Amino acid sequence: MNKELESIYQNIANQSELGQTANYDSYYNPKRLYPIPRAPKRQEINLDPNSTTFYGFDCWNHYEVSWLNSKGKPVVAMAVISYDCHSPCIIESKSLKLYFNSLNNSTFPDVETVVQTISKDLSYCIGSEVAVNVYPLSDIPNQTIYAAFDGVCLDKLDIECSVYHVMPDFLSTSSELVEEVLYSDLLKSNCLVTNQPDWGSVQIIYKGKKINHEGLLKYLISFRNHNEFHEQCIERIFADIMRFCQPESLTVYGRYTRRGGLDINPIRSTEPCAFDGQNIRLIRQ
């Protein structure tokens, strides 16, 4: 990371509440939300922030949502939050947790008001429309928990690993043309600011020259001591595969384990992709 980027993210560390002891609000406080611009990290990996050559979204699931109804009785719920990958900013995850905590002792007349409030606040924070669904526990649709992504699991490959900082040079292709769906549960990186571990699974769907599976797995494992936010890691994987393997089409989908009741699930693709049907839940989630 160059010195300019280091300065930007040091300012984030100083101004946000990441890595700091936080005070919890007793009542609704949208000022707890903290945006992080996407552009600096995209410039680092040569991904044009204004490009329309990639698509995708970020999906968050929140399992610890609560507020008071008009009679002061608590309501507990789950929330699904999604927004386009071309939003100017992402939401800093701890700030989102603190924002939701500020709802705990706040009164709302109905679920619709909660949804409207959250959508308005998050949209203002990131400078783009945010879709929000809130499900009281009694209204949550039946949800299948999947043991793994669809596709061929790379993790069964018997490889030696010794590089734990991102090494895209592991990526290579043969001349054989294929369409493949691959996945790994070995994705691990660290928070850019706090160094806390982020655990995830990643699915790679592509068409083009066959990517060497051993090299791809070594590449994914090389994120192990890398410091970046979830969304940035998935974009880096997408950008590196596009650069080093040059597939005709590519989709990279990451699903991370939760922290503070929140899990983050970014998807990036060369093809337009709708959110509907994509928010599957894996066994570690």
UniProtKB/Swiss-Prot annotation:
Q: Which pathway does the protein contribute to?
A: tRNA modification; tRNA-queuosine biosynthesis
Output the GO biological process annotations, alphabetical, semicolon-separated.
Answer: queuosine biosynthetic process; tRNA modification
Give a Pfam family name: QueF_N
Keywords noted in UniProt: Cytoplasm, NADP, Oxidoreductase, Queuosine biosynthesis
What EC number(s) would the UniProt record show? 1.7.1.13
Q: Which reaction does it catalyse?
A: 7-aminomethyl-7-carbaguanine + 2 NADP(+) = 7-cyano-7-deazaguanine + 2 NADPH + 3 H(+)
What is its subcellular localisation?
Cytoplasm
Q: Which residues form the active site?
A: 191 (thioimide intermediate), 198 (proton donor)
**Binding-site positions, NADPH:** 93-94, 259-260
Question: What is the recorded name of this protein?
Answer: NADPH-dependent 7-cyano-7-deazaguanine reductase
- Gene encoding the protein: queF
